[in-house]
Amino acid sequence: MRNAALEIRKQILGIANRAKSPHIGSALSCADILSLIYGEILYLPYANEVDFKNRDIFLLSKAHSAMALYASLYHYGYMSKEQIEGYYSNGGTLPAHTDKTSSPYIEMSAGSLGHGLPIAVGMAMSIRGQKNAQGKQRKVVVLMGDGEVQEGSVWEAAMFAPKQNLSHLMVLIDRNDLQGYGRASELLSYEPLEQKWSAFGWECKRVDGHNMEMMKESIMTHCLSQTHKPLVLICDTTKGKGVGFMENKLEWHYYLVSDEVYHNALKELQ
């Protein structure tokens, strides 16, 4: 998994460099999470396989991190090199924020924050009781940013989901504590997150969002339990993770990856 996350980060840098698009810091912070989700958690047959209709569902609610999603899909064989090289370009099919029509593996069009969890709750309700070819209940997994936890729609869905006994719904919050204009905890503090989610009836755990073994153990323990509660993992992460001069720096929410920056960043990843 660690090698996969490293390769995904390299792809993210390449995509950002070619397209000269922002949000590199946000994409790097969730590379480990996405590597785990696609490598170990999701049941995701290819779109031309019979059981694709019984796939698990993943929603990227923090859609400005689309580069990380595209890089992950490419690494695990769900997207072609041609597709990701056409990201954010004339004639390309992959936009800067996710578009459901761009790929069968993109489950939701997004951009405006706070919608991933409400949509995930509806999807989880609609597939309750449905099993895949492995005989397992289909899952819905959603990745959110910590800044979007400030959205009221998130808390409406958070209150509603436990009442529906959606144990096959899993939320991962990329808590890098940096959003568009500063520290999320200072602009509109959302703490104590654990107590809030737990009070609404979720199984809630705080984990290192760069420790894939820890995250996997938490998810597998939940899946094997008899709980009726949905799961939320508060994943403590570092914006720009893996590239020292980008780490924990607000400006890399916006800065572009020039050729010089790209080569220097690759050296750090090596």
What are the language-model segments listed below?
Residues 136-138, 186-218:
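Conserved thiamine diphosphate
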Residues 151-176, 232-234:
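A short alpha/beta connector and helix-capping loop motif
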Residues 212, 217-270:
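Glycine/aspartate-rich loop-and-adjacent alpha/beta segment that forms the canonical ThDP
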Residues 5-21, 174-176:
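N-terminal capping segment at the start of a domain
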Residues 71, 99, 153-155, 181-185, ...:
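Short acidic, glycine/serine/threonine-rich loops at helix termini
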Residues 15, 22, 27-163:
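Cofactor-binding active-site loop characterized by glycine-rich and histidine/acidic residues
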Residues 32, 64-65, 176-177, 211, ...:
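Glycine-rich beta-alpha junction loops
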Residues 56-58, 138-142, 169, 227-237:
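Generic beta-sheet signal
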